[in-house]
Amino acid sequence: MDIKKAKFVTSMASYGKFAGIGLPQIAVAGKSNVGKSSLINALCRHNKLAKTSATPGKTRLLNVFEINGGTGDAFHLIDLPGYGFAKVDKGEKLRWGQMMQGYFDNSRELRIVLQLVDIRHDPTQDDIDMVSFLRASGIPFQIVCTKADKISRGSRMKYTAAIGRALQAQPWELICCSSETGEGRDQLIRCIGEAIKMPVEFIDEDELTDEELPEEE
């Protein structure tokens, strides 16, 4: 599988308003400014598909993209709003939590979450909480280390080992990516291709609230 075409579908503050057509969903999650929009653009080879911003925390909606529409490899890519951005009021934090919980509670087509972390930094408590939530809920996820071009290959193992320890994953289970160089794109495409063929029985709806989502700081 490869991504041949992509288009923006809608932005929404509530997942319940999205009248999907039953396509598999791939969600992209991560801390504000981790590079979600840049990664989506690199995956789709479309520099202006997802809007990037120098202001962390600007994306406050669920953004939906249709990938490979009209083909056997069609799916929806869901860009989840970033977490962990400090400069928001309590009302905004509450809306973020409700939006995210609403998505995970109501999405029947979610196949996998691409959980992004910045390879240069140790995972935050929010990252750890997010991975714990996904793991406890039985939702498949793939940890993706962004901005891999910012560190030397010789020192990469040190950084991935630290991320693996924090998130209870082996370093070789991580995918290192760079939106600048295209590194890791083929691995992610294979991961997505396998995920969209998966059944959805893995999600136990009774477990979705056992672990709390990270708080929007």
Each PLM stretch: what is its role?
Residues 3-16, 150-205:
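Canonical P-loop GTPase G-domain recognition
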Residues 83-93, 120, 149-152:
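Flexible beta-alpha connector loops of hexameric P-loop NTPases
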Residues 65, 146, 188:
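Residue-level signal for inorganic ion chemistry
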Residues 43-47, 104, 167, 192:
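Hydrophobic aliphatic residues
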Residues 1-87, 202, 210-216:
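Conserved G1/Walker A P-loop phosphate-binding module
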Residues 22, 48, 61, 73-76, ...:
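Helical mechanochemical/support elements of P-loop NTPase systems and associated helical scaffolds
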Residues 98-172:
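Conserved C-terminal guanine-recognition region of P-loop GTPase G domains, centered on the G4
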